[in-house]
Every structure is written in structure tokens, then in C-alpha cells.
Amino acid sequence: MSPKFCSPGQVQTKKCIEEVLHFAYEENLLVMADEVYQDNVYLPDCQFHSFKKVLYEMGPEYFNGVELVSFHSTSKGFTGECGFRGGYMEVLNMDPQVEAQLVKLLSVRLCPPVPGQAAMDVIVNPPKEHEPSYAQF
């Protein structure tokens, strides 16, 4: 699922995401949420909703019962950094044996480029007000 269907697409409503998560819960499905465009919502009446946050707000039964993989990347235009190759995925409630195989699969791939991973670090942990680079960020 993509809460924002590609860069020119529509933004999914919270209700739509709740319906997807409810369906995944009922059918025991893994949800893969492509959230790389979360910072590219420009209309005032549209808002990005994280699948994980919506899942949490649905209560412990859902939050602890839905397998969710959430993706984010530096390659999709946070501040014009397209071309950097860096990203991460967060795994929630995945069967430990499946997660072990996923880690194994990811471990045998080539290492990502350092500049992209450095950019990803800044996106997930931006400079704080008291830090020298805050004004430039």
C-alpha cells in the first residue's frame, strides 16, 4: 500500500488506511506500506497518515495483531535529494522465523552507498535547534 500513490497521486484517508488494516487483521495478511512520499503532500486539506500510527490508534488488538512493514527512502524528494540511494524498513509483528530469513536475504546484498545512508540518518534524526546545522536544514 502507498498512503500517497506515487508523487502525483492521491493521499489515502485515515479511514481508508483503517479499512485496509482491518482487512489485513481479519485475513491475517502482511501489509507493506510504501511511505516514501510522506513529506510530499502539498494541499492544505490533505494529510499524510502513517500506517503504524493508524494501527496504534486502532488499539492493542490490531497493533499487536497485524504484520506491517513500513518503507522510507531518501530517494523521493524530502528536500531535493533525489538520486541518493538510502532507505530503511521497519518491521512490526513479523513471525520471528520469517524475519530471520528477511535479515539473511538483506545481509547478502551489496552494501548501500554511504552518502545515501548518511542522508537517511539526517532525515530520521534531523538537527535540533541548538545544533550548528539546524539553520541550514
What is each stretch, according to the model?
Residues 5-30, 37-84, 96:
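Active-site pre-lysine segment of PLP-dependent enzymes
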